[in-house]
């Protein structure tokens, strides 16, 4: 892991960052989920000032994104910017463990997405006769850089070739705002061609063109405008359902002494502080009641 951090910090990031668009928001210093959400909000407000709330949002999602990044094309794309055989050899060594023996199936993985979890759970015979050199895992430094860097041709196509002003990407999630639905359809078809050239797959179930008046969801936030033109940013319901379950688990852990009451309070308030900036006051008040009920039980 130390090697990966050194490679990314000293070589890959300095070499690749100048080629990234500003609205590529993941895993970079000074950026992240909060950055991407703020940029989308800024884009929506600017769009509204220019065009009102008439228009559309194109939301695109890559299917099994990290599982389907081809090692050879990823390394070639980095090598074109770094030009160092030692770096290429390191990348080949670091990515090799993610290659999979798929000799148990004759599935054409150029036509359908590879699923590493399904592959892991499959008990078919493997004889090493067919190795799939894809997947970069999730979480490792090189994997994160791969997710940020590899779809750059899609970013360039949208921002430079198609002049999409209101465009942003967070790893495998993309949004584009425009007043012309036909234009967005044309851009989507172009992105499909770019994705095919990269060996990536677009999730048709999660890819939609939605009227702005209806609102749309991106990175777990529902964006919509009120009749008066105010932008609303509401976390999806799942956010609070999951936290309610977590609160119950924390309460049970505190009740049996595995965590302290102070830990229980700090963990909840830490989570809550991340959501107070959004339009979810009623949901937070409801969850606060659950929090206080558990806290009262712990203190008596």
Predicted features along the sequence, with ranges:
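Active-site-proximal segment of RNA-dependent polymerases
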Residues: 8-70
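Beta-rich nucleic-acid/ligand-interaction surfaces
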Residues: 27-35, 175-178, 209-213
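PAPS/PAP-binding and catalytic site of the sulfotransferase fold
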Residues: 7-10, 191, 195
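Surface-exposed helix-capping loop/turn segments at secondary-structure junctions
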Residues: 17, 160-166, 199-203
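Non-catalytic, well-ordered alpha-helical scaffold segments
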Residues: 1-5, 9, 34, 38, ...
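Right-hand nucleic-acid polymerase module
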Residues: 1, 5, 116-133, 137, ...
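A common structural junction motif
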Residues: 82, 192-200
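Conserved polymerase palm-domain catalytic core
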Residues: 43, 49-171, 176-187, 210
């Amino acid at each position: 892991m130390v090697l990966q951090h050194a490679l990314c910090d000293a070589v890959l990031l300095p070499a690749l960052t100048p080629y990234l668009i500003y609205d590529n928001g993941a895993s970079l210093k000074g950026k992240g989920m909060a950055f991407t959400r703020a940029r989308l909000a800024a884009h929506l407000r600017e769009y509204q000032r220019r065009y009102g709330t008439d228009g559309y949002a194109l939301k695109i999602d890559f299917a099994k994104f990290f599982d389907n990044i081809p090692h050879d094309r990823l390394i070639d794309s980095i090598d074109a910017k770094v030009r160092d055989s030692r770096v290429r050899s390191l990348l080949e060594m670091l990515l090799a463990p993610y290659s999979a023996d798929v000799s148990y199936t004759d599935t054409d993985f150029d036509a359908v997405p590879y699923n590493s979890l399904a592959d892991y759970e499959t008990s078919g015979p493997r004889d090493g006769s067919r190795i799939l050199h894809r997947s970069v895992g999730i979480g490792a430094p090189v994997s994160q850089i791969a997710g940020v860097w590899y779809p750059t041709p899609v970013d360039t196509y949208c921002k430079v070739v198609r002049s999409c002003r209101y465009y942003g990407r967070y790893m495998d999630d993309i949004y584009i705002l425009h007043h012309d639905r036909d234009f967005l359809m044309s851009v989507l078809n172009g992105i499909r061609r770019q994705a095919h050239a990269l060996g990536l797959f677009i999730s048709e179930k999660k890819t939609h063109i939605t009227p702005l008046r209806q609102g749309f969801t991106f990175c777990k936030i529902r964006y919509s405008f009120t009749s008066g033109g105010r932008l609303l940013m509401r976390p999806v319901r799942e956010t609070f359902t999951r936290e309610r379950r977590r609160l119950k688990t924390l309460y049970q852990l505190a009740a049996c002494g595995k965590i302290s009451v102070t830990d229980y309070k700090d963990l909840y308030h830490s989570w809550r502080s991340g959501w107070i900036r959004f339009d979810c006051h009623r949901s937070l008040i409801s969850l606060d009641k659950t929090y206080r009920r558990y806290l009262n039980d712990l203190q008596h």
